[in-house]
Amino acid sequence: MTAKDVKFRDGARSQIVKGVNVLADAVKVTLGPKGRNVVIERSFGAPVITKDGVSVAKEIELKDRFENMGAQIVKQVASKTADVAGDGTTTATVLAQAIVQEGMKHVAAGMNPMDLKRGIDKAVGVVLEELRTLSRPISTHKEIAQVGAISANADDAIGKIIADAMEKVGKEGVITVEDGKSLDNELDVVEGMQFDRGYISPYFINDPEKQAAYLDDALILLHDKKISNIRDLLPILEAASKAGKPLLIVAEDVEAEALATLVVNAMRGILKVAAVKAPGFGDRRKAMLEDIAILTGATVISEETGKQLDKATLDDLGSAKRVEVRKDDTIIIDGAGDAARIDARVKSIRVQIDEATSDYDREKLQERVAKLAGGVAVIKVGAVTEVEMKEKKDRVDDALHATRAAVEEGIVPGGGVALLRARAALTDLKGANGDQDAGIRIVLRALEAPLRVIASNAGDEPSVVIAKVLEGSGNFGYNAATGEYGDLVEAGVVDPTKVTRTALQNAASIAGLVLTTDATVADAPKDERAEAAPSPELGY
């Protein structure tokens, strides 16, 4: 077993605090509209230039093992905040550093760390309630664009494209971010349900120019097994032909005689038809077939529902205004499903999302919700160089998460003002003893930290800015982008309540752990000279 190096009390805490400060000082330069860039070396290729706090945090590993513990603890604050709220990582890091630094002064003065933590937790609980009071809901295109712009380091173009995407696919729709092929940002929207399976045979194509099969006012047959015998399909084919409507067949596979007959019918123009494989595998395939069934008003023909293909009727088929089938994907637009059943299905999948343990499962379930509830929008990020593309994509991603958070829980005045205003709720708050009161005062002081850093990064004197903001009330604050004071909500300087709340919660949680740490254990450094010494038996 490797020998361990153990440090106790002040020796343990001081090394951890050094690590906290190194990481926080590197991250906090990115805070605010006038935040500075951080250049990160890469083993291969050009360095990365970023203003994204969590990207900076993830890169930091310190040589000293004990200091590195502190850095990794604060890195957890940034990562957890990013996971829950998608933004606010830099604010969380700044708050954590402020609480740790203030707390360490009191611990050094001989106060009880556990009582300090109780006071901190009590104060944070009150501040969170105050933030909910300050919060207001958002819904308009302009408000959504403002939140997106702020989170993308004051980039109005990014805010606008995110607001456009949300308007197109709804607040539940999937919005993905990809590399663009031009210099400008572009928005592509896929309406309806899209899944990644294309036509089984290219002979189903009815638009040679676009290499696709388009079926208008189509009937849709869903089957969870392979179809190889044409006799099983005949009743449905005859019914579709009599109804004079095109037919989309979604099955595990269509092969042999059945496929040949469908191809001949399509080529001769007897029946407009296209066949595609069902999306997904195993249980996920069954669930997705059921999603399509609910969206289109169909019944899945399967043993589980007691339905047989040769006994299927027109009542078992779904329908959609338009179906587009390409080589690799199929889009069902404007399905005829019952709205109440679609809503119930979405709610059911949301419950599964809350219970999902793996990120992969959660992501796939969210995609299913989006396909049922709205659609899919793709933001293609344009840039001149690859370095700029990476930096811009990080900002778009942050802005997207922040905007979703704002729609979910509302907004508060930005620029660190909401936290400053929330301090009013702590004025009369008392703990059970003097040490807990000190814990409350630690939070009171730490709530200034984000505004101090924003002002400092903008080249202004933090104490002067804070004094000026405290003279006003409500939404009155400091707009670092313009250097002016005024109503921040009017000026579009807002933060999602969820982001501010999560940042404070995580910062206080981790800072409390640092303050109550009394011992640290790390691998002892290896004695390289002893390892390099030659063996005397070898006769050197």
UniProtKB/Swiss-Prot annotation:
Cross-referenced InterPro entries: Chaperonin_Cpn60_CS, Cpn60/GroEL, Cpn60/GroEL/TCP-1, GroEL-like_apical_dom_sf, GROEL-like_equatorial_sf, TCP-1-like_intermed_sf
Signal sequence region: none
Superkingdom of origin: Bacteria
Residues that, per the record, bind ATP: 30-33, 51, 87-91, 415, 479-481, 495
UniProt subcellular location: Cytoplasm
Alphabetized UniProt keyword annotations: ATP-binding, Chaperone, Cytoplasm, Isomerase, Nucleotide-binding
One GO term of the biological process aspect: protein refolding
Pfam families xref list: Cpn60_TCP1 (PF00118)
Family of the protein in this entry: Belongs to the chaperonin (HSP60) family.
Quaternary context: Forms a cylinder of 14 subunits composed of two heptameric rings stacked back-to-back. Interacts with the co-chaperonin GroES.
Name recorded for this polypeptide: Chaperonin GroEL 2
